[in-house]
From Swiss-Prot:
Superkingdom assignment: Bacteria
This protein's name: Putative membrane protein insertion efficiency factor
Keywords recorded for this protein, A-Z: Cell inner membrane, Cell membrane, Membrane
InterPro entries: Membr_insert_effic_factor_YidD (IPR002696)
Organism: Brucella anthropi (strain ATCC 49188 / DSM 6882 / CCUG 24695 / JCM 21032 / LMG 3331 / NBRC 15819 / NCTC 12168 / Alc 37) (Ochrobactrum anthropi)
Purpose: Could be involved in insertion of integral membrane proteins into the membrane.
GO cellular component, one term: plasma membrane
Lipid bilayer topology: Peripheral membrane protein
Predominant location: membrane
Protein localization: Cell inner membrane
Keyword Transmembrane helix: no
Entry similarity comment: Belongs to the UPF0161 family.
Membrane among keywords: yes
Native organism taxonomy: Bacteria, Pseudomonadati, Pseudomonadota, Alphaproteobacteria, Hyphomicrobiales
NCBIfam families per the UniProt record, alphabetical: membrane protein insertion efficiency factor YidD
Length: 119
């Protein structure tokens, strides 16, 4: 029998695939609002602009995951700095969201998130 519709464990309902971060995350109001804005952009404006991102994951996927992992303030700054780097003279290639933030990052020094998201 074909096992295409089953998840890796081989049992249960088919696994749902998504282009965004699918791990469990705390759904605080800020995170829900931030990820909703990113998802709105993905559904509406992204298809009009076209595929022009130089990174993997794309900038909108990066922003979604950064907000889901680290909250609206930290993840929003990381997503903004990623979009700024995604230009003709910017970086390119594989650039994942850090799993944990450094302890020297302070909420009142948002420009330090540039260094965090560029690694």
């Amino acid at each position: 029998m074909c096992s295409c519709g089953k998840n890796r464990a081989g049992e249960g309902a088919p696994k749902r695939y998504s282009r965004n971060f699918t791990d469990p995350w705390r759904k605080t109001p800020g995170r829900v609002i931030g990820t909703s804005f990113v998802r709105f952009y993905q559904v509406t404006l992204s298809s009009l602009i076209g595929n022009s991102c130089r990174h993997l994951p794309t900038c909108s996927e990066y922003a979604y995951e950064a907000i889901a992992r680290h909250g609206l303030w930290s993840g929003g700054w990381m997503g903004l700095f990623r979009v700024v780097r995604c230009g003709p003279f910017g970086t390119h290639g594989f650039d994942p969201v850090p799993r944990a933030l450094s302890s020297d990052l302070k909420w009142y020094l948002p420009w330090r998130y540039w260094r965090c998201s560029a690694s």
